[in-house]
Every structure is written in C-alpha cells, then in structure tokens.
Amino acid sequence: MIIPWQDLDSDTLNNLLEHFVLREGTEYGEHDVSLADKVDEVRQQLKQGLAVIVYSELHESINIVSKATFSSAPVDDIPE
C-alpha cells in the first residue's frame, strides 16, 4: 500500500527519510555528502513522484522505493 508522503507529520517524514538514507548506505563517489543533503535528495524524489513510500502488511514494514520498482513488482516482492 502506498502511503502519501504529504499525509505524514513533518517530523515523522524526516525520521523516515533519515532512517532510509542511513539504512541504504548509498555511495556518492569521492565526495562526502551530508546526511541532510541525502535526505533532501530522497525528499525531492518523493515530491517529484519518482519514489513512493510503501507499507507492507505482510512484513509489517515501511520502505521507500522508486516508482518504477513499485509499478513493476508485487508489493510483497519489493526489497526491504
């Protein structure tokens, strides 16, 4: 199930974004990128509709995935 990011309290959304960024450990190359910049990048992807927040009832978990990943996979097959 998609959770609209606009429906989340701003603190809740920020905590979710920080948790996601820290969990993902995305590599940004030679240059260090601050946590705030990484969070802002994911926030922009949500605002632009490139990413969605997905809740899995089966796994009782929440994740952020690309819109393309969500559109092409059953919700229970989306990587956590």
UniProtKB/Swiss-Prot annotation:
InterPro entries per record: UPF0270, YehU-like_sf
Cystine pairings recorded for this chain: none
One matching Pfam family: UPF0270
SUPFAM superfamilies reported in the protein's UniProt record: YehU-like
Top-level taxon: Bacteria
Family according to the record: Belongs to the UPF0270 family.
This protein's name: UPF0270 protein ASA_3305
